[in-house]
Amino acid sequence: MEDLLNNAKQHLCMRNPKLIRIGLRQVESIVYHVAKPSHDDKIPREIFLKLQDSPLYNSTTPCIYALDSLLEYQQNEEAYEKNFQFIQKLIDDLLHVIEGLVLIHPKSQTLFEDKATLRLFIHLLQPSQPSMLQVAAMKTLVCIMADRPLAIRLFEQINGLQQICVVFKHKQTSQDTRFQILEFFYFYLSPEPYSIDVIAYRKTRTEKQAYLSKYLSNVQGLRDDLDKFQPFGKLDETFD
């Protein structure tokens, strides 16, 4: 498995989108087999998870590098115009793979506790980006921020919440994107975990409501809906 992961990493770290796709397909295949193991499965989950603990074989890091490369490619208008459908689909697939990786290996969430990495999502949350990528970016953000108050605080510091509100209020924003942003708001307004590891970064629901209210009206209404419908299950407000 080390060879498989290393080969995928080499492709993902190339600046060529076609080579990135090869690496992505390799990681995608591994994640699929790990997430849905069968009796004759050749990729034991335990081995994969142990390898993901190693910086040498972790698959999330090269995926982040690939995302940076593809977003840079988007800035090259001439090249992007010729391949925009291919690049958009590749970015979308890449975000889905990142989701899978952090869900299977939650320790990889810590790789996103970095402002430069989180800024990649700011690029994806521009009104000019296609709805498909905006939606995928919002879903991925929830996965990488779940139970990670530090990542949420860093995203606030780079004006990530403000940018999400800009997209939410933009006239041309699709209903799909708005729906996904609403789901993110509910996630954001939910209680954060309380433990010695995260207490220094944790905010209460009231603090987050006040922060979000700087950029969005009727946040109290969102919180009331969250309390009433509890889309993520019963809210633990012990420390709020």
From Swiss-Prot:
InterPro entries: ARM-type_fold, Cell_div_Cdc14. GO terms for cellular component: cytoplasm; new mitotic spindle pole body. Transmembrane segments: none annotated. Pfam families: CDC14. One of its GO terms (molecular function) is protein kinase activator activity. It is found in: Cytoplasm, Cytoskeleton, Microtubule organizing center, Spindle pole body. Its main location: cytoplasm. One of its GO terms (biological process) is cell division. The keyword Zinc does not apply. The keyword Transcription does not apply. It comes from the Eukaryota. Keywords: Cell cycle, Cell division, Cytoplasm, Cytoskeleton, Mitosis. Interacts with sid1. Has a role in the septation initiation network (SIN) required for cytokinesis. This is Cell division control protein 14. The lineage of its organism: Eukaryota, Fungi, Dikarya, Ascomycota, Taphrinomycotina.
